[in-house]
Amino acid sequence: ETVLSELGPEEGAALCAALDTEPPVSVRLNPAKCAGAAEPGAVQDGTGAAPGGYGSPQGSSGTDVPAPLPVLQNADGRVPWCADGYYLAVRPQFTFDSDFHAGAYYVQEASSQFVGRLMGGEGVAGKRILDLCAAPGGKTTLYASLAGPDGLVVANEIDRRRAQVLADNVRKWGTGNVAVTTCEPRQLGDFEAWFDMVAVDAPCSGEGMFRKDAQARAEWSEGNVKL
């Protein structure tokens, strides 16, 4: 009712219909664990070679390499703005995939992978990045891949329960260039001008969950957003 009243019957109905469609599934490969994936600094502009070795049937040289990740046997095209991003035709049971638990890839919406393209123009490799609202860690792991071994990502999450999930995902990703903190943002103000980049994916209205979770729609209200 709120959507229809705010957008009108035509646009409102179109939005409601879109929210009822199955969201596309996409994953992002881990360059540190998939041989031939994009090098640090190439992920954000789509110039990295097609992932090979552990990640695809052919290496960047075109020679035969070990079998691809099983999850990519279900690939349904590349994510245009992320060299390591792939759409999947159907959603597999990720919890049963050892590659998922080993951090060989991260399940992440293609729209979230676009942040790498936004940051890419600044030259991310070797930079110090503060991810201020980091849990559960999807963007943190992307920043870690972009920064490379000479960079540093400080992933901050004030909610300690969510910070544990963040730490688990960072550990699986395995790049070794991420520090997880649970500071109040004002505490990090003491590091003025120390970071090269600050990323803030702030808590918001939650509308991005509407397509994934019917309960999120049922619980949404202007009052909850203001909270």
PLM regions and their residue ranges:
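S-adenosylmethionine
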Residues: 1-227
